[in-house]
Amino acid sequence: MFTLDKTYSATYEEKKSKFIAYLCAYSEFDILLKQLKNEHPKARHIVTAFRYINEIGQIVEGSSDDKEPRGTAGKPALHVLQGSELINIGVLIVRYFGGIKLGTGGLVRAYSDAVNLALKECELIKYEKRENFKFTSSYSDLGKVEYHLQKIGITEIKKDFLSLHVEINLEATHKQIEELKAYLKN
């Protein structure tokens, strides 16, 4: 399975209709949807689809046709995510109607093609399950700890500065956490 770490977009045109597909990390999905509604107030539709792994390891999927004929927009976008083995990803497709009806088959192809075009722009990352890890560091060691975290590729860090030490909460792969534990023992 694969995921991505930033938002990508591509524009596809079919019979004067414009389809702007945005692929994003699922954690950014709701924020991006609100942003697109503000940025594209004249768009006829904003179709969505998503896939993510929940806290108990199940794949959760969903889609919305946003007033397009049922099954012609969100489902085809979701099928592209499934077929490409993408996870923890959302896709949002902004459609501007060009005045020519595409028909149900045309809509299915157009939405699928828009997502596939955006996928060609992406740098996909192999998905690795991430875990939470919490530890403390003295203020004097914090710089060295931060350097080591950066060195092993851990970037999702939350620090709480307490009176005697710093509490660090992070999210990383199992391998990264094991490397960090080995470093902290020394």
Q: For each predicted feature, which ranges?
A:
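Non-DNA-binding regulatory cores of transcription-related proteins
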Residues: 156-174
